[in-house]
Curated annotation (Swiss-Prot):
Signal peptide: none
Record-level GO BP terms: mitochondrial proton-transporting ATP synthase complex assembly
Lineage: superkingdom: Eukaryota
Localisation per UniProt entry: Mitochondrion inner membrane
Keyword annotations: Acetylation, Membrane, Mitochondrion, Mitochondrion inner membrane, Transmembrane, Transmembrane helix
Organism: Mus musculus
Subunit note: Interacts with the core subunits NDUFAF1, ECSIT and ACAD9 of the MCIA complex. Interacts with ATP5MC3, NDUFC2, TMEM70, MT-ND2 AND MT-ND3.
GO cellular component labels: mitochondrial inner membrane
Residues bearing PTM N-acetylmethionine: M1
Pfam families xref list: DUF1358
Mitochondrial matrix membrane side: 1-28, 102-140
Protein name (record): Transmembrane protein 242
Mitochondrial intermembrane side: 50-80
Role according to the record: Scaffold protein that participates in the c-ring assembly of mitochondrial ATP synthase (F(1)F(0) ATP synthase or complex V) by facilitating the membrane insertion and oligomer formation of the subunit c/ATP5MC3. Participates in the incorporation of the c-ring into vestigial complexes. Additionally influences the incorporation of subunits MT-ATP6, MT-ATP8, ATP5MJ, and ATP5MK in the ATP synthase.
Length: 140
């Protein structure tokens, strides 16, 4: 007599997709990508500030302190603009991603991938030999 349930090693349709190890891997990957992006943004901002200070230190120092003519310093204005710009960028990408997700009517990343493959043409894969650097860089 056959059983209707899944055997060992098989998954039923009612179970949550993916094992806990897969979910943990995705969470770790998301944390890694988020921290790498944050580190890149911070490095870019610090590099830009140090370059501005190196280029003209007297103007940089004038911009760090508020005066009677300027009630807000230039650096605090720049930080506020960076914060609002980052917020708008994150929210904008999230809204666009959510709108595309809902417009396509997909429920998982596998559905999204198959939908994208059906919409866009396939990318041809050439197995030709790679060009040699001597050939590419050779003068006429």
């Amino acid at each position: 007599m056959e059983t209707s349930g899944p055997g060992p090693g098989e998954s039923s349709e009612l179970e949550a997709p993916g094992s806990p190890d897969d979910r943990l891997f995705l969470v770790k990957g998301g944390i890694f990508l988020g921290s790498a992006a944050a580190a890149g943004m911070l490095a870019g901002f610090v590099t830009t500030l140090s370059l501005a200070k190196k280029k003209s230190p007297e103007w940089f120092n004038k911009g760090t302190m508020a005066t009677a003519a300027l009630p807000e310093s230039g650096s605090s204005l720049a930080l506020r603009a960076l914060g609002w710009g980052s917020l708008y960028a994150w929210c904008g990408v999230g809204v666009i991603s959510f709108a595309v997700w809902k417009a396509l009517g997909v429920h998982s990343m596998k559905d999204f991938r198959s939908k994208m493959q059906s919409i866009f043409p396939p990318i041809p894969k050439n197995h030709e030999s790679a060009e040699e650097w001597e050939e590419v860089l050779k003068w006429k």
